[in-house]
Amino acid sequence: MKILIFCPYYPPHIGGLETHADEFNKYLSQNGIDITVFTPKLPVNAPESEIKYNNVKIIRFPAFEIIPNYPLPKFWSLKFWSLFSQLFKQKFDIVISRTRFFNTSLLALIYAKIKKVRWIHIEHGSDFAQLSSKTKTVIAKFYDYVFGFLIFHFSDQNISISRAVQKFVAKFDKRESPVIYRGLDFESIEKILPDLKIKKEFEKKIIISFVGRLYKWKGVENSIKAIKLLSKDLKEKIVFLIIGDGEDFPHLKKISEKENYIKMLGNLPREKAIGILKISDIYLHSSMPGGGLSTSLLEAMICNCAVIATPNEGADEVIKNNENGILIKRTDTNLAMEQIVHLIKNKQEIKRYSEKSKIDIHNNFNWKKSINLYAEIFKKR
């Protein structure tokens, strides 16, 4: 079987979707499936083409970001059209796209309909995009109603990566959209060493962390405000490490730069981010509605962090309140602050939650199980 995947981003670009897509391809290719990935050449120093895992071919087309974290092909580039047209000379059994609002999903639609190939769309979002300004948010919502509608309606099958995503897809398309959770590459995560340099730098402090793209809907501003509400003596006992970049970075840096217990570390390689998660005590998941299932949340749980989470971005599907973490009912600064205080004052709870969450992730997020579910869908006609 030959599969063509249109992917909005792909490693070495950093993000949860990227690791999801790459690990999906790695484990799917082990079933003897030939995979071609068509993706933006971002970052610009990424190779134009490469082969991974023996039978995963990656083709990167010229692209730019019209706004942060929204890539578009360089339509004026002959190189883009040459690479895209070459795909039409090949025969694929299935076309896959990821996330309806990225331009690559439109490319998948065009290709699948012209070539009359079965098209499976994998959706990662659970709400309309919330951007830094009302104008951008309104434009994004309009785009969703037009192009998102086309993607969901014209695909042959929509797959949701979480139950939250499934509910969102149902707003556009009443066909069944099965939920298939991602797996985690436990072996590669285990090989990454804890960041002992960071641990030594903040010796005797409780390390609180966040990893992810810095969009408004990630709710990191609420986490910063919650940390700021801590009493002076508690602030001296903690450090909050924020790893990631995005359109909210300048704003978040501005509101936190006077606080020496909050560190904005910017974009870091995934291995570095995992190393920091491994020496973190608490992970703050502050998302508003929007994402499907946070990869960073799952990685924090496998790295033995005690999690304080809002129910969004799939957290209420993996966190059982007071069993393997703390689930707060809504995005509320005071509620988050109260739970941070609770864990700082009850360190035995940090240990209990972190141990239970690691077991739960191992049991429920297995790539072999996920790939078997996808394989059953691929067999259908």
Which residues are covered by each model-predicted region?
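Conserved donor-binding/catalytic core segment of Leloir-type glycosyltransferases
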Residues: 4, 201-218, 224-228, 241
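Nucleotide-activated donor-binding/catalytic signature segment of Leloir-type glycosyltransferases, i.e.
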Residues: 250-271
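Carbohydrate-associated surface elements
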Residues: 41, 164, 183
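An amphipathic, basic-hydrophobic alpha-helix
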Residues: 52-53, 60-110, 114, 141-153, ...
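Nucleotide-sugar donor phosphate/pyrophosphate-binding loop at the beta->alpha transition
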Residues: 118, 128-150, 167
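Conserved acidic donor-binding segment of nucleotide-sugar-dependent glycosyltransferases
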Residues: 321-322, 326-333, 342-347
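Short hydrophobic beta-strand element within catalytic cores of glycosyltransferases
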Residues: 306-309
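Short alpha-helical donor nucleotide-sugar binding micro-motif in glycosyltransferases
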Residues: 267-268, 275-280
